[in-house]
Amino acid sequence: MAGEKMVRDISGVYARLFDHRAVLQAECKYMLREFEGKRNDRELERLRESEQKIRQVQEEIPKCITESVKLKDLLEELKVAREKCHEILVKEEQDLFKERREEIFIESKKNWETFIGEIAEEEKRIEEEFEQSAEKLRARYGVQLVRNPKEPDDKGELQPQEIA
């Protein structure tokens, strides 16, 4: 009996020290009542809002995917348009250079014609001076200078001949 009592006391002490099921159950019931009483409506509203947002996101995802594909196509079209604009700018630039080259060519042609005209005038002046000098020499020495053409177009070299 004494041993039995001792076992009961030990098991009672053991139950109080190590078996907390009753305390935990009471604590759980308290938390549940507290949660349901005070937070039930707020948490339920938050859950409903979250569910609604999730549905909206699920509805928007396919739209976003199709728009993404459209954006890729648009990006490709923009790249093509940019390349065409670049080609047009290059052509315009080349046309400007072409116009400038034509202007330079026309100016050079005018300068060349002016130069050729000046050379022709200088040649005439030199010819006249030569003829005057030849006249003076003929008068002074009695020698006549004549041209001996080697070719029909060539004026040839001057050869002295005595005047008879």
UniProtKB/Swiss-Prot annotation:
GO CC term (a single one): transport vesicle
Keyword Coiled coil: yes
Signal peptide stretch: none
Keywords: Coiled coil
Coiled coil regions in record: 36-91
Pfam families tied to this protein: Muted
PANTHER family (alphabetical): BIOGENESIS OF LYSOSOME-RELATED ORGANELLES COMPLEX 1 SUBUNIT 5 (PTHR31784:SF2)
Function: Component of the BLOC-1 complex, a complex that is required for normal biogenesis of lysosome-related organelles (LRO). May play a role in intracellular vesicle trafficking.
Family: Belongs to the BLOC1S5 family.
Subunit-level organization: Component of the biogenesis of lysosome-related organelles complex 1 (BLOC-1).
This protein's name: Biogenesis of lysosome-related organelles complex 1 subunit 5
Organism, scientific name: Nematostella vectensis (Starlet sea anemone)
Phylogenetic lineage: Eukaryota, Metazoa, Cnidaria, Anthozoa, Hexacorallia
